[in-house]
């Protein structure tokens, strides 16, 4: 078991491991590192330095802080991971993690976890993305709500963009919680449709629930 303090930089979970500054990104299929070899939790991994034109220096620039590593689903799926934002901790283990929560089955697309949430009595599928400070929904749903203003966000491969924001009550595990949603640029909206999902849920989910993620076995445990 390895435990790290999380720094939430603008809602993005970042950990320090020796010389490495790591962004934990369940929304990325592949890990990107500043060299082709990464040692993490005593294991060695071969990594991309450049994934479809993306490097950690480009991601650092968009993020607004320096990272050495974007830790994606290919490496994350080797671990059971407990996210505890309230206490600023994340735990990685190859074995079972003792956590008394409610367990549900989840699915995935290219290793990215997909969960079901409910909005306005509609069951919707969301990519569960620790790398997303803002969550996203299609404008066919957000058009029923008042905008609370615009924010700037970025998405690897697309760069920075502005979006209107909407605060929408969302239901998961019998708990209603407020989520700040934006709308994705059309190209990214198409990616969601390819994955058979309606949106992306990020920071607000992890800020409201303690979450144990087991990507390899498509399982999620949660507690309040």
Cite the ranges covered by each PLM segment.
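Pepsin/retropepsin-fold aspartyl endopeptidases
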Residues: 1-224
């Amino acid at each position: 078991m390895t435990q790290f303090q999380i720094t939430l930089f603008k809602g993005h979970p970042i950990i320090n491991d020796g010389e490495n500054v790591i962004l934990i990104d369940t929304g990325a299929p592949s890990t990107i590192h500043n060299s082709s070899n990464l040692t993490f939790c005593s294991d060695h991994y071969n990594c991309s330095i450049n994934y479809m034109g993306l490097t950690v220096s480009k991601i650092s620039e968009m993020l607004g802080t320096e990272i050495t590593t974007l830790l994606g689903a290919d490496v994350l799926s080797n671990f059971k991971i407990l996210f505890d934002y309230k206490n600023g901790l994340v735990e990685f283990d190859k074995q079972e993690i003792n956590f008394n929560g409610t367990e549900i089955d989840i699915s995935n697309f290219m290793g990215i976890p997909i969960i079901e949430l409910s909005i306005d009595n509609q069951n919707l599928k969301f990519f569960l993305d620790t790398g997303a400070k803002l969550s996203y929904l299609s404008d066919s749903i957000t058009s029923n709500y008042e905008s609370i203003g615009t924010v700037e966000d970025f998405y690897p491969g697309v760069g920075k963009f502005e979006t209107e924001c909407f605060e929408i009550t969302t239901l998961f595990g019998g708990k209603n919680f407020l989520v700040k949603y934006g709308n994705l640029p059309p190209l990214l909206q198409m990616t969601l449709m390819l994955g058979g999902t309606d949106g992306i849920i990020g920071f607000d989910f992890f800020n409201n629930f303690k979450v144990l993620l087991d990507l390899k076995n498509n399982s999620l445990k949660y507690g309040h």
